[in-house]
C-alpha cells in the first residue's frame, strides 16, 4: 500500500531545477554509489618518488629532521634506508645494526656495505647480552619447555626497545620497514619489528620491494646484490626462511592483491586457479591479524587499499569468509 519516496532533484545547465521533485523509489534510476576501486596506475619509478615525497613531506610538516631504522642486511630495511637517505639526506638517517646469536655474518657485512655505499652513519649494537638476560629472567617459567616463537620474539622486541631508546635520546623518528605482504599475514612482532613512527613500505607488496631495489640500483649498485638475491629471512632461529611460514611471494602477493585490492571473495579467488587450501589459509591469516595492523604506525599510501586509511575493517573478523 505504501512505497517510499525520494527527493530527486535535477538541475539544468543554468542551475535551474527541472522535472518532478518527488518520485517513487521504483522510478529512480539506479546510481552506483560505490564505484569499484581503480586499478593501481603507479609504475615503480612513481612508487619510488611517492615514498621519497611521503617521507620528506611528513617530516617537513611535522618538524622532524632525523630518522633512525634497524638495518638487518635484508631487502626491506635496505630499500627503506636508501629511500630515507634520498628523502632526508644521508647524514640525517642513522642505521642501527643489531646482530643476535642467529644473525649470519653475511647479513651484518651486507648492512655495513649498504651504509658505506649510501654514506650514512651507522652503529652496531649487539643484542646477545640483552637476549640472554631475558632468557635468564624467564628461565623459572620457561625451564624444560622447547624453543618457540616466544624466544624468537624476544629478539625482535629487544631490537624495538633499543631503537626506541636511541630515538628518544637523540630526537630521531623511527622508520618502520615492514612491507604489505607481512602486514597482511601478520608476519611481524608487535612492539618489535612493527614499532615505528612511519611505515615506509607498509603499502608495498614484497615483490614491489624487490622492484624498488632494482630501481635504486639502476645506475650503480647501491644495495649489495647479495641482499637482493638471498632468500628473505627474519633470522630469529637457525636456518630460518620466510618460506617456512609463508607461501612463496610470487603466489602470495597475487592472492593478497585479489583479496585486498580487488575485494574478491575466497570462492572467486579459488576460481582463478589458486590452491583452495592456500586461499583459505592466507585469508584466515589476513582476517586474524587485523588487531596487529590496528596497532601499526601510519603508512605512506600508494594504493587505494592501504591498511589503515584505505581499508577499514573490524578487529574481530571471525564472520568474514
Language model regions located:
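ATP/NTP-dependent adenylation/nucleotidyl-transfer catalytic domains that generate, transfer
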Residues: 12-73, 77-321
